[in-house]
C-alpha cells in the first residue's frame, strides 16, 4: 500500500466524521461493484476506529433485473456475508433495502410489449426505468438519513459531469472543502466519501480486506484482479461499443454479447420500426416482426449459453412470471393480461401494441426474418472476430 493512500483514506474518514458524525443510522448505496464494495467496507473501518458500534447500517441495492447474472449473484451473496461480518466482528446491525423495476418497466416488457428500441445517448429510457425510478423509491424508504455513494471522479466522464452539474465542485484543491463530497437531492442527503479515490486506491484497499472476508476473492475474479478497467451493468446495454464483461466471464457469455449487438442492429433498421407521423423522430417502436425476433433471440441465447435471464423469473404480474406471460401460458390468457395492464396506453396508442401470437410465432414474419438474417450475416463480416461466430450462430438458430 503506497503512502498516498493514507491521505485519501483520511480525507474519507473526515467526510464521514462531518456527515455521519454522531448519527445512529446511515445508508450505503450498494451496486455490488468494486467501488460500492470498497465504500461499504470503509464504513466498517470508520466504525471501528471511531468506536461507533451503535451505528445502524442499511445497504440499499437496486436490482435492475438486467444485470450480468454473475454480478447480481455476487451482490446478493456479499450482502449476507457483509451483514454477518459486521455483526460478529464490528458489532453493528446491518439491514437491506432491495428494489427492482416494476414488471412493466423491465427490459423484457418494454421491448416485447411496447416495442422499445435499443437506447441511445439521447434516449436513455433504460436508465430512467431500470435504475432511477427504483432508486427514488428506495431513497423514500431510507428517509432523511445520509446515503453514502461510491461515485468517483476517476470513473466515466458522464458521472463526473453529473456531479459537477449538481454543484459538487470545490474552488480549492480536492479534499480542501466539504462541498466536493456532498449534495442535497430533494429530501435526501447524498455523500460521496471516496470521490477523490483512484482505481488503484480501490483495489489496494480491497486487498487489505481479502484476508478478513474470503468471499472478496470472487469480486477480484470478476474484475480480472483489477488488471482491466471493467465496468459491470446491464447485459443488454447498447450505450457501450463492447460489453467487456461478456468477454472475460467465459465463452458462454459471448452469446449474450451477440444478442446485445443484434438488438442494436435490429433497432437501427428503418424497416423494422413502425413509422410515426409526429415527434422528433419519425421512427417509432419495433415492428411485430422485430419483437418476434427479439423473443426468439432471448430463447435461443438461453439455450446456447446455458445462462438464464433471471429477470424473466423474478418479476411477476398477477401471479405469472414474465417468462410464463411471454412464452408459456395460452395466448388468450397472455393477451387478456397485457390488455388489462396496458389498457390506458392501448387506448391512447393502439398502433404500438400487437397480440402475443405475433411475438411468439416468428413464422408469421418469414420475409422480414430472412431479410434480417441476410443483413446480419453480411454485417457480421466486419465485427470483432472473437464474437463474429457467436453472432452468426445465434442469428441462424433463430430460423432453425
Where are these regions (language model features)?
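ATP/NTP-dependent adenylation/nucleotidyl-transfer catalytic domains that generate, transfer
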Residues: 17, 24, 208-400
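ATP-dependent adenylation/nucleotidyltransferase module used to activate substrates
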Residues: 1-200, 206, 395-400
Amino acid at each position: 500500500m503506497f503512502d498516498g493512500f493514507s491521505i485519501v483514506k483520511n480525507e474519507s474518514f473526515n467526510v464521514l466524521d462531518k456527515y455521519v458524525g454522531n448519527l445512529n443510522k446511515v445508508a450505503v448505496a450498494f451496486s455490488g461493484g468494486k467501488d460500492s464494495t470498497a465504500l461499504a467496507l470503509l464504513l466498517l473501518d470508520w466504525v471501528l476506529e471511531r468506536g461507533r458500534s451503535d451505528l445502524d447500517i442499511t445497504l440499499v441495492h437496486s436490482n435492475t433485473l438486467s444485470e450480468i447474472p454473475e454480478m447480481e449473484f455476487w451482490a446478493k451473496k456479499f450482502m449476507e456475508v457483509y451483514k454477518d461480518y459486521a455483526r460478529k466482528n464490528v458489532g453493528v446491525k446491518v439491514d437491506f433495502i432491495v428494489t427492482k423495476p416494476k414488471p412493466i418497466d423491465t427490459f423484457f416488457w418494454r421491448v416485447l410489449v411496447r416495442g422499445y428500441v435499443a437506447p441511445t445517448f439521447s434516449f436513455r429510457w433504460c436508465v430512467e426505468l431500470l435504475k432511477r425510478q427504483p432508486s427514488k423509491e428506495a431513497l423514500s424508504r431510507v428517509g432523511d438519513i445520509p446515503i453514502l455513494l461510491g461515485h468517483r471522479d476517476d470513473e466515466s466522464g458522464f458521472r463526473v459531469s453529473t456531479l459537477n452539474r449538481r454543484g459538487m465542485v470545490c474552488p480549492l484543491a480536492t479534499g480542501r472543502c466539504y462541498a466536493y463530497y456532498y449534495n442535497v437531492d430533494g429530501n435526501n442527503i447524498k455523500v460521496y466519501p471516496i470521490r477523490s479515490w483512484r482505481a488503484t486506491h480501490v483495489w489496494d484497499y480491497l486487498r487489505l480486506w481479502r484476508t478478513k472476508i474470503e468471499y472478496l476473492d470472487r469480486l477480484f475474479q470478476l474484475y480480472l484482479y483489477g488488471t482491466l478497467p471493467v465496468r459491470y451493468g446491464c447485459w443488454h446495454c447498447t450505450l457501450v461499443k463492447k460489453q467487456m464483461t461478456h468477454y472475460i466471464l467465459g465463452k458462454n457469455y459471448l452469446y449474450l454479447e451477440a444478442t446485445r449487438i443484434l438488438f442494436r442492429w435490429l433497432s437501427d433498421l428503418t424497416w423494422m420500426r413502425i413509422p410515426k407521423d409526429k415527434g422528433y423522430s419519425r421512427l417509432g417502436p419495433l415492428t411485430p416482426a422485430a419483437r418476434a425476433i427479439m423473443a426468439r433471440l432471448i430463447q435461443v441465447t438461453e439455450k446456447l449459453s446455458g445462462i438464464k435471464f433471471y429477470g424473466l423469473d423474478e418479476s411477476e404480474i398477477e401471479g405469472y412470471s414474465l417468462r410464463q406471460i411471454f412464452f408459456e401460458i395460452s395466448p388468450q390468457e397472455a393477451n387478456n393480461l397485457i390488455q388489462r395492464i396496458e389498457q390506458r396506453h392501448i387506448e391512447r396508442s393502439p398502433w404500438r401494441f400487437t397480440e402475443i401470437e405475433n411475438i411468439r410465432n416468428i413464422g408469421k414474419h418469414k420475409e422480414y426474418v430472412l431479410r434480417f438474417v441476410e443483413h446480419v450475416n453480411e454485417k457480421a463480416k466486419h465485427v470483432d472476430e472473437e464474437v463474429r461466430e457467436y453472432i452468426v450462430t445465434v442469428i441462424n438458430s433463430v430460423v432453425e
